[in-house]
Amino acid sequence: MKNRMKKLLVLATAATMMTAAFTGCGSSSDGADNNADKSADEGTSNENLSGSLSLAGSTSMEKLCEALKESFMEKNPGVTVTVEYTGSGSGIESVTAGSVDIGDSSRALTDDEKANGVEENIVAIDGIAVITDNDNSVTELTSDDLKKIYTGEISNWKDLGGKDEAIVAIGREAASGTRGAFEELLDVKDQCKYAQELDSTGAVLAKVGSTPGAIGYVSLDVLDDTVTAMKIDGVEATEENIVAGKYLLSRPFVMATKGKIDEQNDIVKAWFDYVNSDEGQAVIKKVGLILPQ
């Protein structure tokens, strides 16, 4: 009897220990799953990843690229990210030639660019704001009026209900993605008559803000109180109106690669993993851009 009781006690103890062991394994697995989910949400972090990543292109994407660059390098201290702001056309040429890893473009890619093996990776949506100096009494235009201003048919603000003042039409240089998108969306490609063509978003913002009678266009995310953003067809340039499809002037922010993302090196793939993570998406929203639907 004593031997039987002893055997039962041993079996019970063993069963308890096995249950605890399996429970422990289950907890460890759940923890690993949770950690994996957390890692995916926060973006790829790899201290062993080392090397360099090069981007070039759109000046309109500077604010976004600098924010992503800083946060990505914090998570991946072994990687050096460099970005050159050379204009959308130049960025696409560079990635096509293989001289950079990623070409930044603030417009959709052309069929010819895609035919050269360049992949259009849309990372954000931006609005193009039409701006004037703060002393201008005209605060909204129809899209038809805007066309006529930039094609030279309307040259004085008095024709639009404003004061007798010459309109100074400011635009971007020919290779600019902002200009390409603006002219395409307005259907005035190669028809515009610019008083000045400037080579960066910041230059347009500064010139319009300091020039009486000036009008220009810039990325929505760089707007500040030095200029006034105009309503177009009665619609304000806001994220809500762009998402709702109400605002005419919106365009994609593209990080183009030569070939698909899964064909790229580990650093490029890690970059896009981060951009598409919850943390990366939060960075995109923080700089005033809209997430692709």
Regions found by a protein language model. Name each.
Residues M1-T23:
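Sec-dependent bacterial lipoprotein signal peptides
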Residues L8, A21, G26-G89, E93-A97, ...:
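Exported/periplasmic ABC-transporter solute-binding proteins
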